[in-house]
Amino acid sequence: MNIWLSMLTTTGLGAIIGGFTNHLAIKMLFRPHRPIYIGKFQVPFTPGLIPKRRDELAVQLGKMVVEHLLTPEGIGKKLTNEEFQKGLIHWAQVEVDKVITNEQSLRHMLEKWDVAHVEKEATEKIEQVITEKIQSFLEEYYTYTWEQALPHSVHEKIENAIPNVSAFILKRAIHFFESEEGKSRLSKMIDDFFASRGTLLNLVGMFLGNVSVVDRVQPEVIKFLGQDGTKQLLTEVLQKEWEKLKGRDVKEVETFVEKEMIVSSILSAVKVEETVSKFLNQSVQQVCEPVRETIMEKVVPSAVTKGLKWGAENVASILNNLHLAEIVQQEVSTFSTERLEDLVLSITKNELKMITYLGALLGGMIGIVQGLLLLFLK
């Protein structure tokens, strides 16, 4: 009975000592948090291992993250993963669709994004671009003649239109002189002519009798205007003038209209400020609706794919610029010892318990061996 009691005692003591020793060793990894002194003498094993080596631990964790966890190869592989790309494209499409189907005005959206004075700046920028383009255009074309400046198709159209212009002018002239206003104007012209000739009017009056001069002249003028020869004559005159104009410099326009006036007239006609204001007052949905399908089906997938491709090709450079090791080191260095202990224990709690139990088991087994040795020695 004493033998079995001795074995039980040695086994129990061995288990208690083994379990307690392992438990104490685990605790000493974290405790005490600060060094303990007796006078000027620092008690050995204080502070605990992790508090004592926290800075080194932070450095090593940073290296471990960069060299073994967040490696360029691993991240690049993830970025080129087909399933990951599909998921990211779908997410991007959902988020972009929320924006482009928004019923708020474009002006309101820009203000919400803190983009101030966009209307004024856009108007000024557009007017500046238009002004620069017009001035550049005029500077170039002012070095040309009209023949050089106008396209060949315009030359053909003008030359083909001259006979029609002649016919139109003569038609309007006939219509004018057939009217009472035209007859009155013709009469005044005749009176002015004879007034400058003195007695010539009396001499003409003797030949015409009671018929007024204008009644005689009006039909002849209309007849003259309606003749083919008159049309041909006017056409030739217009063609000669057109030939003269083609040889003249475009720059001569500046003697009649200055550059600034041309620019100002075009800007007034374009109404940039009004156009920009109307555009900004439209809802985002109205602006984007014509291109919504293109954005969703082509632009977003293409942008995401190209972005991921670029990221995969430059991931090493990106990680180097991020200095992840330093970030991890700085973050770990800011952890309190208590937080670091809680973090490690939250991950390894079950394993550390098993180590304690293993110590008790080994201690118990050693106790049994000791009991057996004592038994044989007796």
From Swiss-Prot:
Record localization: Cell membrane
Membrane topology classification: Multi-pass membrane protein
Top-level taxon of origin: Bacteria
Residue ranges that the Swiss-Prot or TrEMBL entry lists as coiled coil: none
Protein name: UPF0754 membrane protein BCQ_0944
Keywords of the record: Cell membrane, Membrane, Transmembrane, Transmembrane helix
Keyword Cell membrane: yes
UniProt source species: Bacillus cereus (strain Q1)
InterPro entries linked to this entry: DUF445 (IPR007383), UCP032178 (IPR016991)
TM regions (residue ranges): 1-21, 357-377
PANTHER family assigned: UPF0754 MEMBRANE PROTEIN YHEB
Family membership: Belongs to the UPF0754 family.
SS bonds (residue pairs): none
Pfam (any one): DUF445
Any one GO cellular component localisation term in the record: plasma membrane
UniProt keyword Transmembrane present: yes
